[in-house]
């Protein structure tokens, strides 16, 4: 496996501005990030969500055997899946939930007002439930407009719910914040202050020490992004890279097969 991509996702109306994609390949036993661009820069894309997500699907389809890290939930807690397998759940997702608001309210109703977490979210200490107020739009549009169409087309394999298939991109769920916290690298890095820009530089230097290299033109782009989304996409690509050997060693756990697994 030589090709690794990280996608910092957004379900916002101007998703093309918020989504960032880092594309890297292995070179001399290191991960070289060759490009890091906004979703609106993809061929056929725009700042608007509908056009951007269509372009993102096309980009993922064309990624051959890449391992792609996505930073949104790829499933729900098993208690909310109505006894379905993951494949049944994803195929019926758009029929079950007509809007992001309907999705959040249906989950809250089924959970008796609680924000349930999946086992993997508890294990990796991700900050939010998939239908938390800050995350539910991201979950909804990610599942409905990215994952479900690609799965129906058999254009991708979503791990660990599906087995690997040669020549087809593998998608995994990652969480940049959890990765940073696991490595004890976390510090407030989102914002326009000098301290927050310095924190982005510190994280980039930490990545460099573990073998992540950036094409020369990318460093100023990443440091200048005050929202930290460009950096998050690079962290997502690196999380995919460092998870490559873990994929085939992950225990065959029925709960992970339904709820998914966050690779940090």
Protein language model regions, located:
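RNase H-like (RuvC/DEDD) metal-dependent nuclease/polynucleotide-processing core
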Residues: 1-5, 9-264
């Amino acid at each position: 496996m030589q090709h690794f991509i990280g996608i910092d996702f957004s379900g916002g109306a101007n998703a093309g501005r918020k989504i960032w994609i880092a594309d890297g390949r292995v070179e001399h036993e290191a991960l070289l990030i060759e490009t890091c661009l906004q979703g609106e820069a993809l061929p056929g894309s725009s700042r608007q969500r509908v056009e951007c997500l269509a372009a993102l699907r096309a980009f993922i389809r064309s990624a051959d055997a890449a391992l792609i890290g996505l930073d949104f939930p790829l499933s729900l807690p098993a208690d909310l899946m109505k006894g379905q397998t993951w494949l049944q759940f994803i195929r019926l997702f758009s029929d079950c939930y007509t809007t992001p608001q309907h999705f959040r309210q249906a989950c809250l109703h089924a959970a008796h007002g609680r924000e349930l977490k999946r086992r993997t979210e508890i294990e990796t200490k991700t900050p939010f439930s998939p239908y938390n107020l800050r995350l539910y739009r991201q979950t909804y549009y990610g599942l409905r407009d990215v994952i479900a169409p690609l799965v129906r087309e058999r254009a991708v394999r979503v791990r660990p719910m599906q087995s690997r298939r040669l020549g087809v991109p593998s998608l995994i769920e990652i969480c940049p914040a959890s990765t940073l916290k696991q490595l004890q690298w976390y510090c407030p890095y989102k914002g326009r202050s000098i301290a927050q820009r310095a924190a982005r530089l510190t994280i980039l230097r930490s990545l460099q020490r573990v073998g992540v290299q950036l094409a020369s033109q990318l460093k100023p782009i990443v440091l200048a992004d005050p929202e930290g989304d460009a950096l998050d996409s690079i962290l997502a690509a690196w999380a995919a890279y460092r998870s490559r050997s873990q994929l085939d060693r992950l225990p065959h756990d029925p709960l992970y097969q339904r709820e998914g697994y966050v690779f940090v």
